[in-house]
Amino acid sequence: MTSEQTFIAIKPDGVQRGLVGPIISRFENRGFKLAAMKLTSPSRSLLEQHYSDLKEKPFFPGLVTYMLSGPIVAMVWEGKDVVKTGRTILGATNPLASAPGTIRGDFAIDVGRNVCHGSDSVESAKKEIGLWFTPEEIQNYKLNAFGWIYEKE
């Protein structure tokens, strides 16, 4: 199995609303492996780096302020096509366009309070993981369930 990693963050609204467990369960139930996780209060500098591609957008200052408003659960998930599938699990950025059964479709209404963030490409995932985690914080272990989830190649 060819495995990749993605960065998923539960935003302050998701933490405050007690959605950490249900969100983690969605990824575990799908068959992905949790490789790193921490509850953190990021710096303004980290958030500005993380969202650097949105720096020129009018909503950027409000986004950074919102992300500073409470703790965030930062995670690295691993598995086959986890970036693409992770985005599907999250749902559309705008919760009103998200299908029922997705995290945002089930738990969010406003785009500015859409509960979580997920990397949009393998390249973005590598960048984001490098911003939020040191290599030592990412666990490399065998998840025995992978043998029951993936066909042998």
Curated annotation (Swiss-Prot):
Enzyme class of the recorded protein, top EC level: transferase
One annotated Gene Ontology cellular component of this protein: extracellular region
Q: Which domain of life is it from?
A: Eukaryota
Annotated residues that bind ATP are located at 11, 59, 87, 93, 104, 114
Entry EC no(s): 2.7.4.6
PROSITE patterns linked to this entry: NDPK (PS00469), NDPK_LIKE (PS51374)
**Keywords, A to Z?**
ATP-binding, Kinase, Magnesium, Metal-binding, Nucleotide metabolism, Nucleotide-binding, Phosphoprotein, Transferase
Identify a single GO molecular function assigned to this protein: metal ion binding
Q: State the Pfam families in the record.
A: NDK (PF00334)
Q: Which residues form the active site?
A: 117 (pros-phosphohistidine intermediate)
From the UniProt record, list the reaction(s) this protein catalyses.
a 2'-deoxyribonucleoside 5'-diphosphate + ATP = a 2'-deoxyribonucleoside 5'-triphosphate + ADP; a ribonucleoside 5'-diphosphate + ATP = a ribonucleoside 5'-triphosphate + ADP
What GO terms in the biological process aspect are recorded for it? Answer: anisotropic cell growth; CTP biosynthetic process; GTP biosynthetic process; nucleoside triphosphate biosynthetic process; UTP biosynthetic process
**What does the UniProt function comment say about this protein?**
Major role in the synthesis of nucleoside triphosphates other than ATP. The ATP gamma phosphate is transferred to the NDP beta phosphate via a ping-pong mechanism, using a phosphorylated active-site intermediate.
- Which NCBIfam families does the record associate with it? PRK00668.1 (NF001908)
Q: Which family is it part of? A: Belongs to the NDK family.
Official protein name in the record: Nucleoside diphosphate kinase
